[in-house]
């Protein structure tokens, strides 16, 4: 039997619209609006690479089977283009008519290369000759010959060139290397003034073609299909196979071509032919391409008045100053709510393990890491110090494959045992196991979390960490690593719930249990916080629970395929999405369970790919303080009346506002203030504790 289901791709576009809505808000600081606009553009880049690329492959294969929402690939592509046109128009209208004038008034000026003063023109020429021109490689476009390879997601300047003697017309492309900054400064001491690098290249393009006249230029940008999977069944060498995937992406089909709105027809034709771009994948934009490249503008020094007030991460009150992490975790479980509480204890956990002579072994899963990673450095140091270091490096982490290959090679050279993931599955679990010798016995310490071991994104994403030395968790962690490194099965776990073997059945049982309690007239309640909700089985179970009368509150940041407001299926289901300063990334689940709640954190969203095709972990929380805290966190999202939006029956959303007489409540601000208050209270408690000096 079919169930009400919102299309996944259209739901994602609604999420991106919610992000764009933040950029449209006149009450946000100006540079925060620029940041949100850049995020929407970056999101769209990945959406086209992965989701649109996949749909275009399905269309080409002739597949006409509808998805659970009833839409075929062709219908999805048609609807995506229609909505994309509106979103792009909104993006560029905001950028050109609102943000640019406001930035100029504030002293941050985007200067048209056609309107440079003599002093500015000299600066641009100097920058071109010294820092740009030596890195450029013009590519000729010759009729009848194989067209040059156009790099994906790079700015390319197309040129129409006339021979100065014969007048013969030809065309060429000038790719702008990724390593070059987007902005070329022409500041004169009064604020910040800059020219876009593509305009600098276009202005000086004639210098690259001596003896010829550059009659016209236009910037364009290509997005290629990034949904290219490794053929693991035939891959004896996974690392080598991943290198082939990376190479294949450079040659994959064009899924989007971005062109200026005002573009000479002959240049447009040449560009489309060179790129092999379908007409339905071509988008004309009224402004600079690659708005994602304006992210760094949001961090322009000296304009703090145009940014949000800083919310510094706070120390955990459960970790005493001067304590080792092992001392703190040895006393009781430590729950951390990032970034309100610092990620530092997680990094220290691994760094201390690397240097502690009592530590025997470290085992860890790495999915995405920072470019300059203290965690990688610590693991290398641990291996060099003679500890048994085992690292599962997931090579199939999309768009991080190249970095992960390099990381794995560095670790292997240091002496670490490296495993390249699990065949046929992505390993997405967040787990680190440290074995330490204490009083002649081995004791296991475990970090389990919802987010990556990435100190850069840990400042921008909200996540939950648990540090524990409970024996059952340590035993389960050992079983987990034995399974993923030794080709055994994920069985006999006492506490941890792994996917793809046990997590989905356990979730379905938990939901069904709440439904049965509701049918018996008992209180029944579910709270869940996920990034995405797409799995049809989970959605069907939630519908059944709603029919039984279970009160269901879902905080879904992004994709939500569950249809709200359906009197038959979802009468008792409320879904909100919170878009704020930090990217909501934590997964937290609460089941009332007859008054003895079951509370979990997890690495997995409620999506088919996570529950059926990835190695994930769901972690029960047993510490009473941590359980109460997680419930308060969940409840706070449903009190938010400033940054939360209600998901409507058609998949769109409506921003929530305080009711008459109701105070404003912003969940993320509340979490920051709570973390600061807890840290101050702990400092005060320490200050009031007298510790006498004792004779030796």
Segments and roles (model prediction):
Residues 531:
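Cofactor-pocket helix-loop regions in the catalytic cores of large enzyme subunits
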């Amino acid at each position: 039997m079919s169930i009400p289901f919102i299309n996944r791709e259209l739901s994602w576009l609604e999420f991106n619209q919610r992000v764009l809505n933040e950029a449209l808000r006149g009450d946000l600081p100006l540079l925060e609006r620029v940041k949100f606009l850049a995020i929407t553009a970056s999101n769209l880049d990945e959406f086209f690479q992965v989701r649109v690329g996949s749909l275009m492959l399905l269309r080409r294969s002739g597949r006409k089977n509808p998805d659970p929402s009833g839409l075929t690939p062709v219908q999805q592509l048609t609807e995506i283009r229609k909505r994309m046109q509106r979103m792009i128009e909104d993006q560029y209208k905001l950028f050109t008519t609102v943000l640019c004038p406001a930035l100029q008034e504030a002293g941050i000026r985007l200067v048209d290369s056609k309107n440079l003063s003599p002093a500015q023109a000299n600066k641009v020429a100097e920058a071109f000759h010294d820092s740009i021109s030596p890195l450029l490689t013009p590519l000729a476009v010759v009729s009848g010959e194989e067209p040059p390879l156009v790099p994906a997601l790079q700015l390319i300047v197309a040129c129409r060139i006339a021979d100065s003697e014969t007048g013969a017309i030809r065309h060429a492309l000038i790719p702008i290397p990724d390593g070059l900054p987007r902005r070329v400064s022409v500041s004169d001491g009064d604020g910040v003034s800059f020219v876009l690098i593509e305009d600098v290249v276009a202005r000086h393009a004639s210098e690259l073609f001596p003896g010829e006249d550059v009659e016209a230029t236009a910037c364009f940008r290509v997005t290629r299909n990034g949904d290219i999977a490794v053929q693991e069944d035939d891959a004896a060498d996974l690392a080598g196979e991943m290198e082939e995937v990376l190479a294949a992406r450079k040659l994959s089909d064009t899924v989007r071509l971005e062109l200026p709105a005002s573009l000479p027809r002959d240049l447009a034709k040449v560009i489309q032919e060179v790129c092999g771009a379908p007409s339905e994948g071509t988008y004309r934009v009224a402004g600079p391409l690659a708005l994602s490249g304006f992210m760094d503008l949001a961090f322009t020094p000296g304009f703090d008045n145009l940014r949000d007030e800083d919310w510094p991460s706070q120390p955990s009150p459960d970790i005493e100053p001067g304590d080792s992490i092992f001392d703190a975790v040895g006393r009781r479980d430590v729950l951390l709510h990032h970034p309100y509480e610092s990620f530092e204890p997680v990094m220290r956990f691994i760094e201390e393990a690397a240097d502690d002579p009592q530590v025997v072994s470290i085992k860890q899963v790495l999915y995405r890491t920072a470019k300059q990673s203290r965690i990688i450095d610590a693991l290398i140091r641990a291996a060099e110090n003679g500890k048994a270091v085992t690292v599962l490096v997931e090579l199939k982490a999309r768009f991080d494959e190249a970095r992960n290959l390099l990381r794995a090679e560095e670790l292997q050279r240091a002496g670490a045992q490296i495993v390249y993931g699990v065949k046929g599955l992505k390993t997405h679990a967040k787990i680190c196991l440290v074995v330490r010798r204490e009083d002649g016995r081995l004791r296991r310490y475990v970090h389990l979390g919802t987010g990556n071991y990435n100190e850069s994104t840990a400042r921008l994403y909200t996540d939950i960490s648990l540090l524990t030395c409970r024996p059952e968790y340590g035993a389960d962690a050992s079983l987990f690593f034995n399974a993923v490194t030794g080709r055994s099965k994920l069985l006999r776990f006492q506490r941890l719930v792994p996917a793809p073997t046990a997590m989905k059945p356990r979730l379905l049982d938990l939901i069904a249990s709440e439904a049965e309690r509701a049918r018996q007239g008992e209180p029944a309640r579910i709270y869940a916080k996920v990034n995405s909700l797409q799995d049809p089985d989970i959605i069907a179970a939630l519908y059944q629970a709603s029919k039984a009368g279970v009160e269901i509150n879902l905080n879904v940041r992004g994709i939500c395929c569950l249809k709200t407001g359906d009197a038959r299926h979802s009468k008792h289901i409320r879904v909100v999405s919170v878009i704020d300063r930090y990217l909501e990334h934590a997964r937290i689940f609460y089941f009332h369970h007859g008054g003895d709640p079951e509370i979990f954190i997890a690495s997995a969203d409620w999506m088919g790919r996570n529950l059926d095709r990835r190695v994930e972990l769901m972690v029960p929380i047993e510490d009473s303080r941590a359980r109460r805290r997680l419930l308060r966190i969940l409840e706070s999202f449903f009190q938010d009346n400033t940054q939360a939006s209600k998901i409507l029956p058609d998949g769109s959303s409506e921003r929530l506002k305080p009711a008459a007489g109701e105070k404003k409540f912003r969940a993320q601000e509340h979490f920051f203030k709570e973390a600061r208050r807890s840290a101050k209270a702990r400092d005060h408690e320490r200050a009031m504790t007298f510790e006498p000096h004792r004779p030796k």
